[in-house]
C-alpha cells in the first residue's frame, strides 16, 4: 500500500482544496490529511480564524471519499511526530511551499508539489463575503 500525506488548515473547503486532495489521493492508496488545530490557526492567521472549528473541518474532510484519515496537530513538532509514525511514501505540498528542503523531505520518500488550480483561496472567499 502506498501512503500519501498532506497538511493544511482547510478552513472553508473550496474547489482548490478538493482538486489538491483528489490529486494527492491519486498518488497512492491511502490519504492522511493533517490539519492545524484551532489554536494554531489563530496563531498563524489571526484571532478571527478559523471560520470552521477543528472538529467541523475534520468532519468535512472525512466526508470526502478520497480522504482516509484526518489527524490534528498543534505545533510543527506534532506534525513531525505524525510524519515519523505515518512514514508517508509521498508528501503532497502546494507549489507555493517550494522554498528550500524542509520537514516533508526529511520524513517522506518523495515530495510532490501541486500547482494551484485557479485562484481559489479561503482568505479571498472571506473577503468577498465581508465586503458585501
Please provide the spans of the model-predicted regions.
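Nucleotidyltransferase catalytic core that binds NTPs
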Residues: 1-132
